[in-house]
């Protein structure tokens, strides 16, 4: 099932998972608490400034996909929870890794280990790589490994709930063919000549103006 969730929906889902793991005593979340979590300044990239109406619309779309639901158990205030543990049957470590990818975008296994530990214990980078491998083998995959960036040793991983990530084209352009190089050189030479001709014409016009002024003076 291809999800192609919008950025706001990804943020909501990541926040619901994060708060379930970090503050279970306050979970599920009220609309106000969830909105504040979405707009949180720490552990978020990019930063957002969502209104409650934006969050409601996102929750409705997630609910239609079976990824979030409303609950009023134990109180009068409507509260919201995610449904990934029900639909995907993921353990807390896998949920924490997914939440971190949703909240901060593509990251290396080392970055995920350091940042997701606030949600659940992660023994080492190898255990995170094992989790990522399982998420990549999910049907359909929930995570993908991105091509290594120029100048970086480690590869990054991205969640696929928003579809395939847009990647910058880091492939260097091939060198121009000899014929094109000759044409480019000729074009540059002609451009220089045009500039020189224009400068000479301006000088001639200035000289003519000066001569005319002198002629008027001596008449």
From Swiss-Prot:
<dbReference type="InterPro" id="IPR036390">
    <property type="entry name" value="WH_DNA-bd_sf"/>
</dbReference>
<comment type="similarity">
    <text>Belongs to the UPF0502 family.</text>
</comment>
<dbReference type="InterPro" id="IPR036388">
    <property type="entry name" value="WH-like_DNA-bd_sf"/>
</dbReference>
<protein>
    <recommendedName>
        <fullName>UPF0502 protein Gura_3445</fullName>
    </recommendedName>
</protein>
<feature type="region of interest" description="Disordered">
    <location>
        <begin position="162"/>
        <end position="181"/>
    </location>
</feature>
<dbReference type="InterPro" id="IPR007432">
    <property type="entry name" value="DUF480"/>
</dbReference>
<dbReference type="Pfam" id="PF04337">
    <property type="entry name" value="DUF480"/>
</dbReference>
């Amino acid at each position: 099932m291809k999800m192609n969730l919008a950025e706001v929906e990804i943020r909501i889902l990541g926040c619901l998972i994060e708060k379930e793991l970090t503050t279970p005593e306050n979970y599920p979340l009220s609309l106000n608490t969830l909105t504040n979590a979405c707009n949180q300044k720490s552990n978020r990239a990019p930063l957002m400034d969502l209104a409650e109406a934006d969050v409601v619309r996102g929750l409705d779309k997630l609910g239609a996909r079976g990824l979030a639901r409303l609950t009023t158990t134990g109180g009068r205030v409507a509260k919201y929870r995610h449904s990934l543990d029900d639909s995907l049957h993921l353990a807390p470590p896998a949920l924490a890794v997914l939440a971190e990818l949703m909240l901060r975008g593509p990251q290396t296994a080392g970055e995920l280990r350091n940042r997701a530990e606030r949600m659940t214990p992660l023994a080492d980078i190898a255990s995170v790589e094992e989790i990522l491998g399982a998420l990549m083998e999910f049907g359909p995959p929930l995570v993908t490994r991105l091509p290594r960036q120029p100048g970086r040793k480690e590869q990054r991983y991205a969640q696929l709930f928003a579809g395939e990530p847009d990647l910058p084209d880091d492939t260097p352009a091939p060198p121009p063919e000899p014929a094109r190089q000759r044409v480019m050189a000729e074009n540059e030479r002609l451009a220089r000549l045009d500039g020189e001709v224009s400068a000479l014409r301006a000088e001639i016009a200035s000289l003519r103006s000066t001569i005319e002024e002198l002629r008027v003076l001596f008449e």
